[in-house]
Amino acid sequence: QTAFQISSMEEKVAAVTALLRSAQETHGCEKAFIYCNSLSGSVDFGPIARETGLKIVTPLDVYRRLAPQYHSLAVIAANAQGTAGIERTLLTANPALTLRSTGLLPVVLSIEAGEPPEELVARHRLPELCAWYESVGAEALVLGCTHFPYFKEVLARQIRLPILDPAEEMLRLLDA
């Protein structure tokens, strides 16, 4: 995934466009649900949607709508590619927004290894990270990685910050 994200924009656009065109031709695909923050941040899906005629929804569509509602947000994502794309989207939608973000690839790897959410949240000290975010003025925590709903309920019980998870709003946008 990281190798793809750091490849040239032309290579990424060509690969994604070919994949989506194949889905259209083979399966009659009319919509695409891109459930990956770092991929969404490394490829501009607007031109691809126009070229293919597909309705494409990404987590960034949700962040674009959320940004004007806040003055300060905390973002946790899988890696710097993910945080960069999320930050670019949020700040384009609300240039006055204060952002603090963290890439947490070790958390992603723990999820993929099957570590229980309770242990993962404690071992990676996520409540302490969120307490710091709150202490510096964050109004909410953005789950900027689609792996992170795995521990969302456990973390929510241990922090005061509201958690923003784009998944449900993405489904609504896809059906709109």
Where are these regions (language model features)?
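Non-catalytic structural scaffold of enzyme domains
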Residues: 1-176
